[in-house]
């Protein structure tokens, strides 16, 4: 397999750090190696499969949930109950009205981030891949679309690519609710893991991922189990 290393650029999550990526550089066979690369700490954004390669900084840790062992916490059970009126629908096609919800979400909640301002081209660049068709987990409330979890379906795992939702419903914790639905769907499909991207302990935006227990983190080139007793 062939890999490339990106130029350094300002880190999106730790303001005083520079980020460098190790990128899978083969023009073909992405589908063949994607799951193996995920198991080695990589992640997909659009057509690109990458992992952090930042020299002295090791803050980014790939994180995944072994779904058969997961049990929701009391707080997560409350979120499930709070959203019991939401209908979950699976779609294999991107739909035109997804973008308007994405634009509203980015322009309301992430004005300080690298994805602002939202554009259709930017949405397509991370959600779509010319070698993989993701699964779209739709959240509906009273007949209205209020959330989308873009999810990759692999042979033995699901991977959470990106979730966006109606920003006026912040009290419903729809991001956490979407992950709970992804775990449930992974169990139903007999998958082993749900990949959640990267955990960065010093980044407040990432803290919700720590709450899905037990989980595994890719540390020093191997997956290490984190359970309640480790906190």
Swiss-Prot record:
Broad enzyme group: transferase
EC assignment: 2.3.2.29
UniProt GO molecular function: arginyl-tRNA--protein transferase activity; leucyl-tRNA--protein transferase activity
Keywords, sorted A to Z: Acyltransferase, Cytoplasm, Transferase
Name of one Pfam family that matches: ATE_C
Domain of life: Bacteria
Keyword Metal-binding carried by entry: no
Major subcellular location class: cytoplasm
GO cellular component: a single term: cytoplasm
Biological-process GO terms, alphabetical: ubiquitin-dependent protein catabolic process via the N-end rule pathway
Subcellular compartments: Cytoplasm
Catalytic reaction annotation: N-terminal L-glutamyl-[protein] + L-leucyl-tRNA(Leu) = N-terminal L-leucyl-L-glutamyl-[protein] + tRNA(Leu) + H(+); N-terminal L-aspartyl-[protein] + L-leucyl-tRNA(Leu) = N-terminal L-leucyl-L-aspartyl-[protein] + tRNA(Leu) + H(+)
Purpose: Functions in the N-end rule pathway of protein degradation where it conjugates Leu from its aminoacyl-tRNA to the N-termini of proteins containing an N-terminal aspartate or glutamate.
Family affiliation: Belongs to the R-transferase family. Bpt subfamily.
Protein name in the entry: Aspartate/glutamate leucyltransferase
Gene name of this polypeptide: bpt
């Amino acid at each position: 397999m062939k890999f490339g290393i990106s130029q350094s650029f300002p880190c999106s999550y730790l303001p005083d750090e520079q980020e460098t990526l190790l990128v899978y550089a083969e023009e073909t066979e992405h589908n063949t190696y994607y799951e193996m690369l995920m198991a080695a700490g990589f992640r997909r954004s659009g057509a690109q499969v990458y992992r952090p390669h930042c020299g002295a900084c090791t803050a980014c840790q790939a994180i995944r949930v072994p779904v058969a062992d997961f049990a929701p916490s009391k707080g997560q059970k409350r979120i499930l109950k709070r959203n019991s009126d939401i209908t979950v629908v699976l779609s294999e096609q991107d739909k035109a009205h997804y973008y308007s919800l994405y634009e509203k979400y980015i322009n309301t909640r992430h004005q300080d981030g690298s994805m602002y301002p939202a554009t259709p081209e930017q949405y397509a660049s991370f959600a779509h891949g010319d070698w993989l068709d993701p699964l779209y987990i739709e959240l509906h409330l009273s007949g209205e679309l209020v959330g989308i979890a873009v999810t990759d379906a692999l042979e033995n795992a699901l991977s959470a690519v990106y979730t966006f939702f109606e920003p006026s419903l912040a009290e419903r914790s729809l991001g956490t609710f979407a992950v709970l639905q992804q775990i449930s769907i992974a169990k139903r499909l007999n998958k082993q893991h749900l990949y959640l991207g990267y955990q960065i302990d010093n980044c407040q935006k990432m803290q919700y991922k720590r709450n899905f227990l037990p989980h595994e983190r890719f540390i020093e080139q191997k997956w290490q189990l984190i359970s309640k007793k480790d906190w």
